[in-house]
């Protein structure tokens, strides 16, 4: 009779290899492009604390990204000072996000209005937020036809500012779908141009 289906398994993580991978990526992009290292879910099992510490010491990344506020708080507790985006800011976590100098990903109107209200109550001024746009992944993100509404909401407050905009390229790793990827990029470019004409502050 089998007493257990579990076997002892050990994964050895070469942190220098992660850093070298980032260097390879950075070598193929313009210098003005900033790099985000996604360390959510314990850095996908590699150890978020160890990975973040190492990457902050060696450089090469401009931001870390985590899934929820608690992950970002833990990195701050460990002394990580690099900017951190929270990709799924939970209701009720907004004050903790701001007190820990984390930056929320905002992907719908309800979330935008809620975070602005929290930022105003907190006394924030031009607090950095990131806007995600749906260009074809159809999970989360503002649609292109919401640009004017987003701008109207932002024009009514000084509590937040847009730090960056981004999208999720759904099939970028499939060369046969390059046309779809280019359409996604074209949509994001249209959104970017409209936002740059209207917003008073630069963004990524």
Regions found by a protein language model. Give the residues of each.
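Active-site-proximal beta-alpha core segment in soluble small-molecule metabolic enzymes
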Residues: 2-5, 9-17, 33-203
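Alpha-helical scaffold segments that flank or form the walls of functional sites
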Residues: 21-23
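Conserved PLP-enzyme active-site core in the AAT-like
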Residues: 28
């Amino acid at each position: 009779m089998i007493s257990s289906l579990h076997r002892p398994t050990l994964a050895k993580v070469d942190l220098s290899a992660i850093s070298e991978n980032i260097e390879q990526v950075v070598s193929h992009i313009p210098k003005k492009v900033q790099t985000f290292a996604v360390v959510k879910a314990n850095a996908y099992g590699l150890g978020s604390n160890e990975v973040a510490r190492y990457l902050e010491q060696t450089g090469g990344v401009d931001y870390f990204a985590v899934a929820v506020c608690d992950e970002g708080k833990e990195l701050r507790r460990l002394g990580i000072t690099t900017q951190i985006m929270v990709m799924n800011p939970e209701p009720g976590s907004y004050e903790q996000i701001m007190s820990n100098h984390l930056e929320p990903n905002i992907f719908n109107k309800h979330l935008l209005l809620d975070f602005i209200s929290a930022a105003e109550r907190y006394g924030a001024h031009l607090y950095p937020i990131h806007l995600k746009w749906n260009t074809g992944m159809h999970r989360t993100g503002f649609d292109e036809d919401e640009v004017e509404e987003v701008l109207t909401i932002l024009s009514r407050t000084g509590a937040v500012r847009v730090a960056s905009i981004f999208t999720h390229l759904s099939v970028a790793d499939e060369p046969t779908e390059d046309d779809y990827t280019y359409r996604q990029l074209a949509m994001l470019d249209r959104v970017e141009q409209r936002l740059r004409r209207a917003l008073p502050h630069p963004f990524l």
